[in-house]
Amino acid sequence: NELIKKDGKFIAPSGAEVEWIKEESYFFKLSEWQDRLIDFYNNNPKSILPESRFNEVLSFIKSGLKDLSVSRTTFKWGIPVPNNPKHVMYVWIDALCNYLTSIGYPDENSANFKNYWPALHIVGKDILRFHSVYWPAFLMAADLEPPSRVFAHGWWTNEGEKISKSLGNVIDPYEIVSKYGLDQIRFFLFREVPFGNDGDFSKEAIAQRLNADLSNNYGNLVQRICSFVKKNCDSKIFNNFDNNEDDNILLKSSIKRLNNYKKYMSNQEIDKALKEVFLLLNETNIYVDKQAPWNLKKTNTE
C-alpha cells in the first residue's frame, strides 16, 4: 500500500488526496498469471535491470497479484471497450499496446515487427511495475513474447532537491544544451552516475566533469598527438615499424577495454562502459609520455 494516512485522510505518493469512488469495471485476471510471471523471471534474471529493480518486481509478484481493473466509466474520453461503449479502456492498456501497433501488429509477419519485437524498454523507475508486471502478463495472455528487457533508470535532483514547478527549480534543457553543447550534456548524464541510480544535477558538476574528462584528458591527448603529427610528419601516420614492448602492452589493453565496453553496453551499464574508455585514455597518455616522440625526433628522424 503506497498511500499515506495524514489527518484522517489518505494521500497518494503525488501528494494528492485520495477520493474513494465506486464504478463498474472490467477486470484482467492478473492473478492467473502470477506463477507464469515468476517462472519467466526466474528463468530470465537479466530481463529486468538493474538487479535491485529485478528483485523489487519479483518480490511484488510473489506477494500476490490481484486482478486489475482495465476499464473506466467516469471518463468521457478514451478507446471504447468492444461491445460496451459505456466503458473506455484503462489508459495503460492502450498506452502499452502502442509498442506493438507502432511496429505493425497485429501483422506479426511485418518486417518491423520481426525486427523490433521483443524489444528493450528503457523506462523511469516510477512506471516499472506497468512494464514488468502488467505488460508481460497482457502479452502472455495474447500469446506474445514479453519484452527482452526492461531497464529502469533513476531520477535526477537539482543540487540535492527534487525537481518540481512548485520549487521553481525546473532545469531548462534548451538553456543547458545551448551553454554546454548537446553531446557534452549527454556525456555528463551517462558518466556522472551509474545508469539506473538517482543522480544530482548541478552546473558545477557539469563544468567539473567536462573539464576533467573531455578537456584535460581526451582533448589534451588528441591535441598532443595531432599537433605533433601535423608539425613533424606532414599530417601522415606511418605503420612501417615494429612494435616495441610498450606498443604491445597498449594494444593488448585496448582490446581488453573494447571487450569490456561492449559487455557493459549490452547490459546498459553505460557509466562502466565510459569508465573503460577513460581508463584507456589514461593509459594512452602515460604511453605517449613514456615514448616521448618529441625526443625521438632528435635521435631518429625516420
Where are these regions (language model features)?
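Short, structured coil/loop segments at alpha-helix boundaries
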Residues: 46-58, 181, 241-251, 299-302
